[in-house]
Regions:
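Beta-strand residues in well-ordered beta-sheet regions across diverse protein folds
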Residues: 23-25, 58, 109, 145
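Conserved SET/PR-domain catalytic core that frames the SAM/AdoMet-binding pocket
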Residues: 17-19, 27-30, 159
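Asparagine-centered strand-capping/turn motif at beta-strand->loop junctions
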Residues: 24-33, 169
Length: 173
């Protein structure tokens, strides 16, 4: 699809020792006659896990959440666990999120400019219908996306916005 506004977007990926940082910069390159425009975004981070049924996400306890499957709002209580299809949008926590899947740990941080965290796993039934995943692919993947969904950003000509997500491998316990 064509987006009828003047803009520049730059995605930077930085690999470090045990870390990965993804940064997105969006710039309204229009002139004053073009005016402002709004946008939302998400850094779609697909993570490999050993077994999603044993995976847990910590750090979202107490965060407001919207369950996209049930169209229900509430607050997260305890760690996030995965027992089937999962699609929720959280208010991003002030601190880092921790993913544990048995053997491996991952610390997930994001900039305050990305005010949401999307957590998604297709579960077995949906995964079987997806062309880009094997039928049992849901068992070894999890999306933890730094996002900006609830409050779109408005950029006037000349303004820019940036957001980032960083993944850091945690030492074995």
């Amino acid at each position: 699809t064509w987006w009828p506004v003047r803009f520049a977007a730059q995605l930077t990926v930085v690999l470090g020792a045990g870390s990965l940082r993804v940064q997105l910069v969006v710039h309204n390159t229009g002139n004053t006659d073009d005016g402002a425009w709004d946008f939302t975004t998400a850094l779609h981070t697909y993570l490999r896990v050993e077994d999603v049924g044993r995976a847990q996400l910590g750090g979202l306890d107490g965060c407001a959440r919207w369950d996209a499957l049930a169209d229900a709002r509430g607050f997260q209580q305890g760690p996030v666990m995965f027992l089937g299809e999962y699609d929720r949008v959280f208010s991003a926590p002030a601190g880092a999120i921790h993913l544990h899947d048995g053997a491996l740990g991952l610390q997930i941080s994001q900039s305050a400019s990305l005010s949401n965290t999307v957590v998604w796993n297709p579960g077995g039934a949906l995964c079987a219908r997806l062309a880009d995943l094997p039928p049992d692919g849901y068992r070894s993947m999890l999306c933890v996306e730094a996002a900006l969904i609830d409050r779109p950003i408005t950029l006037t000509p000349g303004q820019q916005w940036q957001g980032w997500q960083e993944l850091r491998v945690l030492p074995a316990p």
